[in-house]
């Protein structure tokens, strides 16, 4: 059985880990890094780049470089958060045919699940090259506060990447697994997870291998990206005051600002001051303009204090739902790159009244937890039981647009709940069941997950038919709903596919796309390698011809020159096979030249049969002669 891997699919960075015996191991990618930027880019000629190579060219190719796409996954185009996101990114966010938010590059539309799949493919390849075998199954993490549509879209991304997603696991829960696996003592912990794009807080009880989530809360649109944008806006405002130019209108300058802001933010976690230096950031009639600015930690903290403050309310609600006070928390575990910021640590300490635990690597701990859960599913990790919860209440719309809850938030999953409803009018023969997720009292204020019709109800006075609605939430937090007319036994069941979302045909098409992309990438690599070999041979043959061409016969020299010309022509094409064939032909034709070179070399060594030491002495003598000449 092939290994099941654990993947932390992050907003800013992703990470992959696997169980090696009894302990989890984070796997380094092809670039030698333990985390991979969650960035996908397309070059002008359509080549796809993922991770660090994509990040490196982001400044010069902002419109085709997709970052923080996790913020769009499972969201509708007219969602207010998407509206906000469109203003923050240099790439195009567009409305898909199904009403979802997608992205566009050179007229081709991609779903956020597809972009995420390209990142997952990279993680899959990273694991495969380390393990030396094919990987087909994975555990993938999501923010605890992700709704059903976002979880389903993440599962779809795995499928597009060629992975069977055995389990979707919440990020704070994964972190708790990694933190508590080898600890013998029991206790109550809070996991404070502030990542690149999302914030979660979970309260768990740990003891005897049982990890029980008591409550969870969060904000799926709050993270490091927002901290970066605060700094970008501050720098742009200061520059505008000074130079009268708004850098936000220039996509290239905006991307440079974003990179500088991220770098400054990271530096200010360890230094109290940093300098931002961006020469030639823009130009006007008077010439080029440079941005140089000193930034103190105190100034940065003042710019983002309200963002950190926003994380405190979910912490308060999570404690309230768990029925605990801050003093009853034994340990606070910090997760996510943003928790390296001293001000974040300080505010967490103030809120919980204790020094937070910094013994886990905030960038890797979630992937490690996913690998442990993969080990549990594989049977390699024994005596570990994970009891997670659903983050949001689930229910249906009833008379007057009221949201009637069937399953309350923080209910342990998997779970199943049924309730009987009736018709609202006399003679009603069909009922539309509209399914919502959220905490507001009116259905319209919550997130609609989908709707379906139960038809063929025998006509009867209002209130007489009995319709039983059953909600079923699996261990991934994904919902199935069925409705049954108890009179006729007629049943209608759906796996909630978000009002948008990808259907099976979409996913199949994207799987094929991903496979053809992988094939294209292989072709590109083969072409690049063929050109490298060909160009190297052209160079060495030309050099050899100029130095030793007189040592072979005219016919042989003509054959070499002809093969050389043919290879040069082939190198101007995109045909890898033709280049390889012509490279082979030139190598064959040059054999005689190689022989002539070797025999000339050996012939030169015959007289006096000089030793190596003498050769070195001769070099020194030449230098001395030069010195005498110049004297």
UniProtKB/Swiss-Prot annotation:
Region called Disordered, residue ranges? 598-631
Spell out which residues are annotated as carrying Phosphothreonine.
Answer: 198
Which Gene3D superfamilies did the record assign? 1.20.1270.10, 3.30.420.40, Actin, Chain A, domain 4, Substrate Binding Domain Of DNAk, Chain A, domain 1
What InterPro entries does the annotation carry?
ATPase_NBD, Chaperone_DnaK, Heat_shock_70_CS, HSP70_C_sf, HSP70_peptide-bd_sf, Hsp_70_fam
Induction description: By stress conditions e.g. heat shock.
**Pfam entry (one):** HSP70
Gene Ontology molecular function, alphabetical: ATP binding; ATP-dependent protein folding chaperone; unfolded protein binding
**Domain of life of the organism encoding this protein:** Bacteria
Q: Which PROSITE patterns match?
A: HSP70_1, HSP70_2, HSP70_3
> Which residues fall in a coiled-coil region?
none
Q: Could you list this entry's UniProt keywords, alphabetically sorted.
A: ATP-binding, Chaperone, Nucleotide-binding, Phosphoprotein, Stress response
Q: What does this protein do?
A: Acts as a chaperone.
Q: HAMAP family recorded for this chain? A: DnaK (MF_00332)
Family of the protein in this entry: Belongs to the heat shock protein 70 family.
Q: What is this protein called?
A: Chaperone protein DnaK
Instruction: List the taxonomic lineage.
Output: Bacteria, Pseudomonadati, Pseudomonadota, Alphaproteobacteria, Hyphomicrobiales
């Amino acid at each position: 059985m092939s290994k099941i891997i654990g993947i932390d699919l992050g907003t800013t960075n992703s990470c992959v880990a696997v169980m090696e015996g009894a302990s989890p191991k984070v796997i380094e990618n092809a670039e030698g890094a333990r985390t991979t930027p969650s960035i996908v880019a397309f070059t002008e000629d359509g080549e796809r780049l993922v991770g660090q190579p994509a990040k490196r060219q982001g400044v010069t190719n902002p419109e085709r470089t997709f970052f923080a796409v996790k913020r769009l996954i499972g969201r509708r185009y007219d969602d207010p958060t998407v509206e906000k996101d469109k203003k923050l990114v240099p790439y195009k966010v567009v409305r898909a045919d199904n009403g979802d938010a997608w992205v566009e590059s050179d007229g081709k539309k991609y779903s956020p699940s597809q972009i995420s799949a390209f990142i997952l493919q990279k993680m899959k390849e990273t694991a495969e090259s380390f393990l030396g075998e094919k990987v087909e199954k994975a555990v993938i993490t999501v923010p605890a506060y992700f709704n059903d549509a976002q979880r389903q879209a993440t599962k779809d991304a795995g499928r597009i990447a060629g992975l069977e997603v055995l389990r979707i696991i919440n990020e704070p829960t994964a972190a708790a697994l990694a933190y508590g696996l080898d600890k013998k003592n029991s206790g109550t912990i809070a996991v404070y997870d502030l990542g690149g794009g999302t914030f979660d807080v979970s309260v768990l009880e740990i003891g005897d291998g049982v990890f029980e989530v008591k409550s969870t809360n969060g904000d799926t649109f709050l993270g490091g990206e927002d901290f970066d944008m605060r700094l970008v806006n501050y720098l742009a405002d200061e520059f505008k005051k000074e130079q009268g130019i708004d850098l936000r209108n220039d996509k290239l300058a905006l991307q440079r600002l974003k990179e500088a802001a991220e770098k400054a933010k990271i530096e200010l976690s360890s230094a109290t001051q940093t300098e931002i230096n961006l020469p030639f950031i823009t130009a006007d009639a008077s010439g080029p303009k440079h941005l140089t600015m000193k930034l103190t930690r105190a100034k940065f903290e003042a710019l983002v204090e309200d963002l950190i403050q926003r994380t405190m309310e979910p912490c308060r609600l999570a404690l309230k739902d768990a029925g605990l006070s801050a003093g009853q928390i034994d340990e606070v575990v910090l997760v996510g790159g943003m928790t390296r910021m001293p001000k974040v640590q300080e505010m967490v300490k103030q809120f919980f009244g204790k020094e937070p635990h910094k013994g886990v690597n905030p960038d890797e701990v979630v992937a490690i937890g996913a690998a442990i859960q993969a080990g549990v599913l594989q049977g390699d990790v024994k005596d570990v039981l994970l009891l997670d919860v659903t983050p949001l209440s689930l229910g249906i719309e009833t008379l007057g647009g009221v949201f009637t809850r069937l399953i309350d938030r923080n209910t342990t999953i998997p779970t199943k709940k049924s309730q009987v409803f009736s018709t609202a009018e006399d003679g009603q023969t069909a009922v539309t069941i509209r399914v919502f997720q959220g905490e507001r009292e009116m259905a319209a204020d919550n997130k609609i997950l989908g709707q379906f019709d139960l038809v063929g109800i025998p006509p009867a006075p209002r209130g007489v038919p009995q319709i039983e609605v059953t909600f079923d939430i699996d261990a991934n937090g994904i919902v199935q709903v069925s409705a049954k007319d108890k009179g006729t036994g007629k049943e209608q069941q759906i796996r909630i596919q978000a009002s948008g979302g990808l259907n099976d045909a979409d996913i199949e098409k994207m799987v094929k796309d991903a496979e053809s992309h992988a094939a294209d990438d292989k072709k590109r690599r083969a072409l690049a390698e063929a050109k490298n070999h060909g160009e190297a041979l052209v160079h060495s043959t030309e050099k050899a011809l100029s130095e030793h061409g007189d040592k072979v016969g005219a016919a042989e020299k003509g054959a070499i020159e002809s093969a050389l010309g043919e290879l040069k022509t082939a190198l101007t094409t995109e045909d890898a096979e033709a280049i390889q064939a012509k490279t082979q032909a030139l190598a064959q034709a040059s054999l005689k030249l190689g022989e002539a070179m070797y025999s000339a070399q050996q012939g030169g060594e015959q007289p006096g049969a000089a030793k190596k030491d003498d050769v070195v002495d001769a070099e020194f003598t030449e230098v001395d002669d030069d010195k005498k000449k110049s004297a």
